[in-house]
Amino acid sequence: MSHGEEKEPGIPQKVDSIDEIFVGCKSWVLKDGQDRLAEILSINSRRDPPKFYVHYEDFNKRLDEWITADRLQIDKEVIFPRPKELEEKKDSKKKKQQQNKSATPQAASATPDGGDVMDLDNLNVQGIPNEDISREDEIKKLRTSGSMTQNQNEVARVRNLNKVIMGKYEIEPWYFSPYPIELTDEDVVYIDDFSLQYFGSKKQYERYRKKCTLRHPPGNEIYRDDYVSFFEIDGRKQRTWCRNLCLLSKLFLDHKTLYYDVDPFLFYCMTRRDELGHHIVGYFSKEKESADAYNVACILTLPQYQRMGYGRLLIEFSYELSKKEGKVGSPEKPLSDLGLLSYRAYWADTLIKLLVEHGQEITIDEVSSISSMTTTDILHTAKALEILRFYRGQHVLYLNSDVMKRYKKLKNNKRRSIDPQKLIWTPPVFTASQLRFAW
């Protein structure tokens, strides 16, 4: 569906009982003392009374939940989906219209060298394509990527685990993750803090914990300060551990869809140390060979450690690796909503600090070289900060009073940061056979 089109509304009807409601209907649901419209995504009739899995209209998917029947407001009209025959006719009509549209030749660009001109008003840092992609086209375009979004229909919409216990933390998952189906009937799933192995019962977990000797991610420790450590793990060498990490992260990342083939990736895990060992706080993955110059494929801070500044450390560390490699980089798009906010804040603070402390004229390319940020990300950030001006026939960066105030705040902020001197790392080099996917 294109952005300009509205989805056809359903058919509102009164119902006499809960039994008339099925998957695809929209009903009013009592949430936090208010009635909210929600779509029924799944019904669990194995339980008595049955439970309904709902998605609230205009709310993020992470708020989807299982509810009991008493929260459904059946005294109000229920919106039923339109009959399938009507939908199919409408879809075929749309397809014909799209085919006719694509057959119409497009007007030539008014700019002769359009490839060298950057449209500053339409910089798309989120990287989400605007056109619709059919299932067949999507499969053709599919590549082994850590965070590629697939069509909504291809991603399971029902969260399948209710609760996860990881170390001393009890966590409620946000999204579906393809754990073994036998775990989905368990009220609680136990995940080992070090090996990330999963268990359906506490007894199984405790027996495993007595035997397992792993106390840190199974890779090389490449960074350590008095606060955090970073480990580099090769997906090809540690497949089981990396797959477990991807399954865990899928619980909290909506558009992470490829989790099985970890061979083409390196994983950089941030940990906190205590007397028991290194506990994973967050991670980012990175393609061993990225054709698009991405320096991050997936990035996640586990929910129990969010809002503590760890996400920013992960982002900063990814750029420190890019500096060591002598490359510019950018995260793979699209970013999650939380990821985009974190990156925008990091880009803005980095750009402001660099411009103020440099103290003299500097080009965008020089800013890119020093920070390892791409010119697109720099321009997008400058535009968001409203410091990009057109002066005497060229674009210049103008430091206004708001930027100077933000810089003073940055200077007074005692935020933790990565110490480049403590990064003991040489960029890995891979042969063609090492980069080959192991199918």
UniProtKB/Swiss-Prot annotation:
Domain MYST-type HAT: 156-427
Residue span(s) of domain Tudor-knot: 23-73
Protein location: Nucleus; Chromosome
GO cellular component, one term: histone acetyltransferase complex
Residue ranges, annotated region (Disordered): 83-120
Pfam families: MOZ_SAS, Tudor-knot, zf-MYST
Positions of modified residues (N6-acetyllysine): K256
ZnF locations on chain (C2HC MYST-type): 189-214
Keyword ATP-binding set for record: no
Residues where acetyl-CoA binds: A297, C298, I299, L300, T301, Q306, R307, M308, G309, Y310, G311, R312, S336
Domain notes: The ESA1-RPD3 motif is common to ESA1 and RPD3 and is required for ESA1 histone acetyl-transferase (HAT) activity and RPD3 histone deacetylase (HDAC) activity.
Family assignment from sequence similarity: Belongs to the MYST (SAS/MOZ) family.
The protein's name in its UniProt record: Histone acetyltransferase ESA1
Species this protein is from: Kluyveromyces lactis (strain ATCC 8585 / CBS 2359 / DSM 70799 / NBRC 1267 / NRRL Y-1140 / WM37)
